[in-house]
Amino acid sequence: LHRYKFVRILNKVLLKGILLFYKRKFKLNDPIAWTYNPMVLELMESLSPSKKVYHSVDDLSASPGIDSQALKEEEARLLKKMDVVFCTSKNLYNHCSKIAGKEKTHYFSNVVDYEHFSKAKTDLAQPKELKNIPHPRLGFVGALSSYKVDFDLIKQVADERPDWHWILIGKVGEGQPETTIEDLQHRPNIHLLGPKDYKDLPQYIKYFDVCTIPCPKNDYTDSMFPMKFYEFMATEKPIIAKNIDSLSDVTHAHFSYSKDSDFIEGVESILSKKSHDIIVWQELVKENTWETRLNKMFKVLQS
């Protein structure tokens, strides 16, 4: 519905009323207006904030069902008025810094709730749904939408390696309702478990043999930094991921593939290893926790 101008205007009016109510209720005289939504410049300014912050986490103009041109125009207007801009990928940084200026734009990748996902290293019981699924297990957690997940790759690997079992956790069609999964459902080694509570994810990931980020190459994925990358890393499970731009700096910490055949070779390589470079993973994760990242962001805001 957000593609319709009337809906966008109505959303802004409603949100403005809610925010002004809470601003008065909590007596917020000099709030910092921090948004992930590029369509709310006037709303931010109505709060009379001490600083305006835009946190760019995805190329939203490349999302299905979005009025790309309207979003790009609104984002450009917003970027020119921001005091600080944070970006979660280098492609987003390059885009935003051209409009907002490099002195205002800062690159910080996505992060992990380490305390939560590191629970996978503890003695958690195996979920009942997994007990009858053979090993090796290739796991994925996230939105099961075709612009985010390469379903053709998953089907190909399932057919070529019938002894490998895919475990897919997430809502089908999130952000893309037309997504279909009939071809996946008919394969005995692809297990669609549906969405799970956030609190239970470590319990499932603990029993994966390989964590996968099998995204397609497109305008959306070219600018995303997968939240699940550091979440998987915090569990100390090996990761194989598509060679998207945002992960180019961390290829030493996971297996990166470009072709479908590389994926199969990568999984075989991972499964043949008895140990992995846990120390490198631990160092990377420590640099990319919510606590570490917020401290760095607050320093930027205070400067």
PLM feature spans:
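Nucleotide-sugar-dependent
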Residues: S146, K199-Y204, C211-M233, A241-T251
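Membrane-proximal helix-turn-helix segments that form the acceptor-binding/catalytic region
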Residues: G17-R24, S68-V85
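Nucleotide-activated donor-binding/catalytic signature segment of Leloir-type glycosyltransferases, i.e.
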Residues: G170, E178-P202
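Acidic anion/phosphate-binding donor-loop and adjacent secondary structure
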Residues: A62-S68, S97, V112-L130
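Carbohydrate-associated surface elements
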Residues: N91, F108-A120, F208
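A charged, aromatic-enriched C-terminal amphipathic alpha-helix characteristic of glycosyltransferases
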Residues: S275-Q302
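Conserved donor-binding/catalytic core segment of Leloir-type glycosyltransferases
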Residues: L130-K148, K155, I167
